[in-house]
From Swiss-Prot:
Keywords: Cell membrane, Membrane, Transmembrane, Transmembrane helix, Virulence. The lineage of its organism: Bacteria, Pseudomonadati, Pseudomonadota, Betaproteobacteria, Burkholderiales. This is Secretion apparatus protein BsaZ. InterPro entries: BsaZ-like (IPR006307), T3SS_substrate_exporter (IPR006135), T3SS_substrate_exporter_C (IPR029025). Residues 341-406 are annotated as: Disordered. The gene is bsaZ. It is a multi-pass membrane protein. SUPFAM superfamilies: EscU C-terminal domain-like (SSF160544). Belongs to the type III secretion exporter family. Coiled coil: none annotated. It comes from the Bacteria. It is found in: Cell membrane. Residues 370-399 have a biased composition (Low complexity). GO terms for cellular component: plasma membrane.
Length: 406
């Protein structure tokens, strides 16, 4: 059998919690309940009300009805004891729920005959937890003896003074001394409680330790094969809806960044002369948009500055291109129209001197950042030569033969 050396996983801890196997420092819960009761007793337990009831009965001298008399005492007892009991119950329930992380142990409620197995009972009798409880019991005996010794040294005068106290003060004095004794015992037992909680936490994780095979098997059951899951997740992320695919096919061009952003631009002068954003995707979906555009013959222009600017200034799909980006978009549309005119064998596009805001190309290669950076013609290109694909640096057939709206 493999040695269990691995720490329990989060799933292992959750499954154990459903079975009722959670970290439980019962003595800490008892400490909180006792401390709450000791501090609340002087305020909630009013013995003067009981004494006043006796005085009332004695002063009247009448024979009370036994039924009414018992009912009155029961009602008085509930009025005094109910708040005290409810407060102690809440003080005990809240720490228990916190320790179990508010997990309902459904499986532990079911009747289990294996709990009556004598072999398992003998194992529990001679387990590390049983040895821990035995040592803890001996330590508590020593703590109680120390508490009595310290209490006698501090409050012996008050204890012997009870014989000379007035009867009306006896109840109050007994409550005060009892509270002091309880709090002193809890203070002396605090080191034992901390040590018990630490050992209990160690034993709890020791019982839930796993071997390496269990860890691997649990990972396969919960996550599946890592390569298959990664591939499936990648394919799922790259799938485009039919609406986005249709928008890509109807776009005049796609401007990319070049792998993280894909912006589709559509212009229809019959509707409105201002171009608007038809596609707006990022990361894996942007890559899918680029691939689909190349497959459908839609030009893909890789322009980092323009793509980032449109993405920043047009926060959603189906919004108009901002005023700051219209110039760059129109330059791309004009260039695409010139490329398609050259591909149809028409006259070569007119050569014009670039403006100061438009960088010149050197040796037929467009400067970085230009919308046509990947599609420049060499100076000696013959008229009517086929232009490279707007989205492919290695050239080839034109991406689309339809007219571009400039």
């Amino acid at each position: 059998m493999a040695e269990k050396t691995e720490k329990p996983t989060a799933k292992k801890l959750r499954d154990a919690a459903k079975k009722g196997q959670t970290f439980k420092a019962r003595d800490i819960v008892a400490l909180i309940v006792i401390a709450t009761g000791a501090l609340a007793a002087p305020a909630l337990v009013d013995l003067t009300r009981i004494a006043a009831e006796f005085v009332r009965i004695a002063s009247t001298g009448a024979q009370p009805n036994p039924g009414a008399y018992a009912f009155a005492w029961a009602k008085l007892f509930l009025r005094i004891a109910a708040p005290f009991v409810l407060l102690c119950a809440a003080a005990g329930a809240l720490p228990s729920l916190v320790q179990s992380r508010f997990t309902l142990a459904v499986e532990s409620i079911r009747f289990d005959l294996t709990a009556l197995d004598p072999v398992k009972g003998m194992k529990r009798l001679f387990s590390w937890r049983s040895a821990k409880d035995a040592v803890k019991a001996l330590l508590y005996v020593g703590v109680f003896a120390l508490t009595v010794r310290v209490f006698a040294g501090l409050y012996h005068a008050d204890v012997f003074g009870l014989f000379r106290a007035r009867p009306a003060l006896l109840g109050h004095m007994w409550i005060v001394l009892t509270v002091r004794l309880v709090l002193l015992f809890l203070l002396c037992a605090l080191p034992v409680l901390i040590l018990d909680a630490a050992v209990e936490y160690f034993l709890y994780h020791r019982e839930l330790k796993m071997d390496k095979h269990e860890v691997k098997q649990e990972y396969k059951e919960s996550e599946g094969n890592h390569e298959i899951k990664s591939k499936r997740r990648e394919i799922h992320q790259e799938l485009l809806s039919e609406e986005i695919k249709a928008n890509v096919e109807q776009s005049d061009f796609i401007v990319a960044n070049p792998t993280h952003i894909a912006i589709g631009v559509y212009v229809n002068p019959d509707i409105v002369p201002i171009p608007f954003v038809s596609v707006r995707e990022t990361n894996a979906r942007a890559l899918a948009v680029i691939r689909h555009a190349e497959a459908c013959g839609v030009p893909v222009v890789r322009n980092v500055a323009l793509a980032r600017s449109i993405y920043r200034n047009s926060p959603r799909r189906y919004s108009f291109v901002s005023h700051d980006d219209i110039d760059g978009v129109m330059r791309v549309l004009i260039w695409l129209g010139e490329v398609e005119a050259a591909n149809r064998g028409g006259p070569p596009p007119e050569t014009r001197a670039p403006t100061s805001a438009e960088p010149q190309a050197r040796d037929g290669v467009a400067p970085p950042g230009d919308a046509c950076a990947d599609n420049a013609f060499p100076d000696d290109a013959p008229p009517g030569a086929a232009a490279p694909n707007a989205g492919s640096p290695d050239g080839g057939a034109p991406a689309r033969t339809g007219d571009q709206n400039a």
